[in-house]
Amino acid sequence: MVQSAPASEIAALILRGFDDYREQFREITDGARARFEQAQWQEAQRASTQRINLYEEKVAETVAGLRVGLADSELLDVERWPIIKSAYIAQIDLRLDDELAETWFNSIFCGLFSHDNISDGTMFVHTTRPSLRAHARAPYTRTYRPGGDLRQALEKIFDDYRFDVPYDDRERDLERIDALLHSNLPDWVCKDPDLAIELIGSVFYRNKGAYLVGRLFTPDEQWPLVFPLLHREGHGIQFDTVITDEAEVSIIFSFTRSYFMVDVPVPAELVAFLKRLLPGKHLAELYTSIGFYKQGKSEFYRALINHLATTDDRFVMAPGVRGMVMSVFTLPGFNTVFKIIKDRFNPSKSVDHATVIQKYQLVKNHDRVGRLADTQQFADFRFPVSKFEPECLAELLEVAPSTVVMEGDVVLIRHCWTERRMTPLNIYLENASEAQTREALNDYGLAIKQLAAANIFPGDMLLKNFGVTRHGRVVFYDYDEICYLTEVNFRYIPEPRFPEDEMSSEPWYSVGPNDVFPEEFPRFLFVDLNQRRLFAKLHGNLYDAKYWQGLQEQIREGKVIDVFPYRRQETPEQLLG
């Protein structure tokens, strides 16, 4: 029944919806340990998708409940919302996840009002929380002090983090991890009587792996520390390796990875701890990496508006070949690209606007195996005209007039995606040395293979559609033709019927909409003959339809293929049942 309600009651209803979301988020997350112990890999993938979709589902549910229970005159009077916001601040003040609660409030407000009502008076454009309140106390961690006996500390770690499934070979792993630490670190570190190991109490789960995350430190220095664990079905839990290199740990927390499942009692504390381990990571990326992608979006937006307010940076078109479906622009001093859908596509493209949006959602929900860039979707961005280079603004208005609109001295962008900026692979190769070319082309082939192992076919595999990250990894970022590998029909080109067939400009065989002929890849992918020959040596099996058909068969049999986010001795394409 629609009834009158004070601001505090509306705030309480919003917070009740948040509590429901957080409870279900924790429930899904808490199941990660059992899924790991029971080797339920497909269930883990489903849980990941379920948790991603949960936020929008619960926002919609809360908005619908407010509309049913409250009169429009109360709920949709925007002038009341500063009072509702004040009441809400009082109610979340003692919470341990208050920054997430602020973002939830913003989502509810945007579900009720158009974006032109957004202001810091009606919602949390800027946070009211103290900056990284986590400085008040340390996150839940376990600390070990080897006192010169690293092996004994490792034994205690193995005991403290044991699972309900036994270790495959505890002694073997202890010896190997001890040896790796002595190999990775300066000799004096392992002997330092003041050396300490600090590990986050909660285990990080993702796909088929579990990770212990923390640091090694002395009074003067620190190193990040990650122990990846695997469950070898039929054998037990295995400490796979140890990682102490900041760049390698950064890759594990990369924007190209799926989100971790980890118990996070106080999000700000955990993010502050991770920030100390990985100072090059932005808060947005760290929040996103542990599953709070909406909080990551809030942190990104705040960083963006602060950058625009404090610098003379102006939007320009992104370097590289212009896209047939998307138009891409960037801020030179802000490590992000902004992607909008063009009003009209190149005639060779068979997709429409709705299909493009579906493709981006597919990427959001799917295991990105370190080879697909994560994106954030935004609606109704407003920027001053003065923040655009004239050539950039003119091009955007020309190619996407339904999306980019002038409102006086403000540019309205109705819909866009943001994505980490990378160097397009084709541009990278233009300036690469022989060794860099070989490494990049090898990683390009691995990217295609690892995506295929995750049941993803990029569609358009041209070099320009892949980027190179600051760590030198090759990542796919053009999603308008992406699809599930199992939807593709990989074929061999039939033998010509007559000699004249090979000279014809038209194929002598029928071609279905999902047909792909890997034999055609070399001439489509590489203009440079040296690159073409090198890639054939590195990944020539990609030109064979049988290779792709074999992967499809394994995927249809329900096999989940290992793709590791760190270097190891075994092949990254190893199959496990």
Swiss-Prot record:
Location of the active site: 374
Query: Can you cite an annotated GO cellular component?
Result: cytoplasm
UniProt record, GO biological process: glucose metabolic process; glyoxylate cycle; tricarboxylic acid cycle
Ligand binding (ATP): 318-324, 339
Residue ranges crossing the lipid bilayer per the database entry = none
Task: Name the chemical reaction catalysed here.
Answer: L-seryl-[isocitrate dehydrogenase] + ATP = O-phospho-L-seryl-[isocitrate dehydrogenase] + ADP + H(+)
Q: Which GO terms describe its molecular function?
A: [isocitrate dehydrogenase (NADP+)] kinase activity; AMP binding; ATP binding; phosphoprotein phosphatase activity; protein serine/threonine kinase activity
The cellular location(s) given in this protein's UniProt record come to: Cytoplasm
Q: Which UniProt keywords apply?
A: ATP-binding, Cytoplasm, Glyoxylate bypass, Hydrolase, Kinase, Nucleotide-binding, Protein phosphatase, Serine/threonine-protein kinase, Transferase, Tricarboxylic acid cycle
Q: Which Enzyme Commission number(s) are on file for it?
A: 2.7.11.5, 3.1.3.-
Q: What does this protein do?
A: Bifunctional enzyme which can phosphorylate or dephosphorylate isocitrate dehydrogenase (IDH) on a specific serine residue. This is a regulatory mechanism which enables bacteria to bypass the Krebs cycle via the glyoxylate shunt in response to the source of carbon. When bacteria are grown on glucose, IDH is fully active and unphosphorylated, but when grown on acetate or ethanol, the activity of IDH declines drastically concomitant with its phosphorylation.
To which protein family does this belong?
A: Belongs to the AceK family.
Report what the protein is called.
Isocitrate dehydrogenase kinase/phosphatase
Species name: Pseudomonas aeruginosa (strain UCBPP-PA14)
Q: Its encoding gene is what?
A: aceK
